[in-house]
Amino acid sequence: MVRVISSQPRKQRKARYNAPHHMRGSLLHAALSKELQGKYKRRSIRVIKGDTVKVLRGDHAGTEGLVDYVITRDARIVVDGVSVKKADGTEVPRPVDPSNVMITDLNLEDKRREQKLSGE
């Protein structure tokens, strides 16, 4: 993907939609809380399943929950407790853009992720 220079919203959306797989990870970064920023010396990190996040924007602002799964194709995450009610009354998960959440607790089961954060 060539670096997007245009400021036209339609071209920004098209670039995100047509982004290659190896660049979609950068679309899944979310800000770290102030405590985590101080601890790990970085502002954001890619969201993975098992992270605890707090929704900052939208109808579900203030909701905190675990990330159930990550939809890399759409660059969205599904957070436990963020759902909408369908017309028949059933609850369905509501995907959230990672830019609208803040990571409050990290899932460090992946040793490679832990090493990357510690700077080794």
UniProtKB/Swiss-Prot annotation:
UniProt xrefs under SUPFAM superfamilies: Translation proteins SH3-like domain (SSF50104)
Keywords: Ribonucleoprotein, Ribosomal protein, RNA-binding, rRNA-binding
Location of the region described as Disordered in the Swiss-Prot/TrEMBL record: 1-26
Compositionally skewed regions (Basic residues) per UniProt: 10-24
GO terms, biological process: translation
Entry-linked InterPro entries: KOW (IPR005824), Rib_uL2_dom2 (IPR014722), Ribosomal_uL24_CS (IPR005825), Ribosomal_uL24_euk/arc (IPR005756), Ribosomal_uL24_KOW (IPR041988), Translation_prot_SH3-like_sf (IPR008991)
NCBIfam families (alphabetical): rplX_A_E (TIGR01080)
Described purpose of this protein according to its UniProt entry: One of two assembly initiator proteins, it binds directly to the 5'-end of the 23S rRNA, where it nucleates assembly of the 50S subunit.
Name of the protein this chain belongs to: Large ribosomal subunit protein uL24
Organism of origin: Methanospirillum hungatei JF-1 (strain ATCC 27890 / DSM 864 / NBRC 100397 / JF-1)
The encoding gene: rpl24
